From Swiss-Prot:
This is Ornithine carbamoyltransferase. InterPro entries: Asp/Orn_carbamoyltranf_P-bd (IPR006132), Asp/Orn_carbamoylTrfase (IPR006130), Asp/Orn_carbamoylTrfase_sf (IPR036901), Asp_carbamoyltransf_Asp/Orn-bd (IPR006131), Orn/put_carbamltrans (IPR002292), OTCase_ArgI (IPR024904). Its EC number is 2.1.3.3. Belongs to the aspartate/ornithine carbamoyltransferase superfamily. OTCase family. Its main location: cytoplasm. Pathway: Amino-acid biosynthesis; L-arginine biosynthesis; L-arginine from L-ornithine and carbamoyl phosphate: step 1/3. NCBIfam families: orni_carb_tr (TIGR00658), PRK00779.1 (NF001986). GO terms for molecular function: amino acid binding; ornithine carbamoyltransferase activity. The lineage of its organism: Bacteria, Bacillati, Cyanobacteriota, Cyanophyceae, Synechococcales. It comes from Parasynechococcus marenigrum (strain WH8102). It catalyses: carbamoyl phosphate + L-ornithine = L-citrulline + phosphate + H(+). HAMAP family: OTCase (MF_01109). Carbamoyl phosphate binds at S63, T64, R65, T66, Q90, R114, H141, P142, C143, Q144, C275, L276, R303.
């Protein structure tokens, strides 16, 4: 076990002091090592004490799992969390981001930012002098993907060559699944209606990152997308900020519900994933949500372990 821990620490040492704004910010080796460390922390084979360091959360979007999992992860690492809601700080009164980022860097050892625009996150990283983590933007959700592939690995073993089918909008979650999956050697299929594809630039980037023969595909037939897949993943059809499009999207996504009939086309041992919150009866049927194939709540738990590993790596606590 000591040898394994040393190997993981060596692979993760280049991450110390770096930002994590995108799944593509880590190499294939570094991404795999984050999952290895997360598994060690989850099993209790590894314990890390960061010595009372401080995480600052800057969340302008609502959050349950991301907020709580970061807070608990930091506590388990022996650190503390400061919740910096813009509504109750000077950010809400127009203080420039560049001033806030530099001041918070004097108080905190790492910042996690959850906001709408990716550029705002990039600006925080530019001005901060401590690591900045993407806790979700409209472009990506990289911490979620770490938990997703940790869950898939727990269910089916080594990831290279496995297939994950994502059924739904080509959104931030889909983007990070493509990028992270490409690095890990996982075939990722995005099953979506016409007009709801991932951004072409992200698709091209994922394909350029693909290792060990992984394929990244966009397929407009949901049944074809899930055919033979080891994991079937879905998300809400209207993300935060798209509530006005709910009715239009319900029509566009008709036939894209992950239900019992669709799951028949997947691998017989396929697992079901959802980043939550879920709208039962829309993107996923109640039966599939509660089925034996569902690993949705394991997946939610794994946010904690994946982020604990990421925090330790970025703060050089290995």
């Amino acid at each position: 076990m000591a040898t394994a821990a040393a190997g993981v620490a060596a692979a993760l040492s280049p991450l110390s002091g770096r930002d994590y704004l995108s799944s593509a910010d880590c190499s294939a080796e570094e991404t795999s090592a984050v999952l290895d460390l997360a598994a060690q922390l989850k099993s209790g084979d590894r314990r890390i004490d960061l010595g009372n360091r401080v995480l600052g959360l800057i969340f302008t979007k609502a959050s349950t799992r991301t907020r709580v999992s970061f807070q608990v992860a930091m506590a388990r690492l022996g650190g503390q969390t400061v919740d910096l809601n813009p509504k109750v700080t000077q950010l809400g009164r127009g203080e420039p981001l560049e001033d806030t980022a530099r001041v918070l860097s004097r108080y905190c050892d790492v910042l996690a930012v959850r906001t709408f625009a990716q550029q705002e996150l990039v600006d925080y990283a530019h001005w901060a002098t401590v690591p900045v983590i993407n806790a979700l933007t409209d472009l990506e959700h990289p911490c979620q993907s770490l938990a997703d592939f940790l869950t898939m690995r727990e269910a089916h073993g080594d990831l290279p060559g496995q297939t994950l089918a994502y059924i739904g909008d080509g959104n931030n979650v889909a983007h990070s699944l493509m990028l992270c999956g490409a690095l890990l050697g996982v075939n990722v299929r995005i099953g979506c209606p016409q007009g709801f594809e991932p951004l072409p630039g992200v698709l091209e980037q994922a394909r350029s990152l693909a290792v060990q023969g992984a394929s990244i595909e966009v397929i407009h037939d949901p049944r074809e997308a899930v055919r033979g897949a080891q994991a079937v993943y879905t998300d809400v059809w209207a993300s935060m900020g798209q509530e006005d499009e709910q009715s239009e999207r319900e029509q566009a996504f008709a036939g894209f519900c992950v239900d019992e009939a669709l799951m028949e086309a997947a691998d017989t041992e396929a697992i079901v994933l959802h980043c939550l919150p879920a709208h039962r009866g829309e993107e996923i049927s109640p039966g599939v949500m509660e089925s034996s194939a569902s690993r949705i709540f394991d997946q939610a738990e794994n946010r904690l372990h994946a982020q604990q590993a990421l925090l330790a790596a970025l703060m050089g606590g290995l």
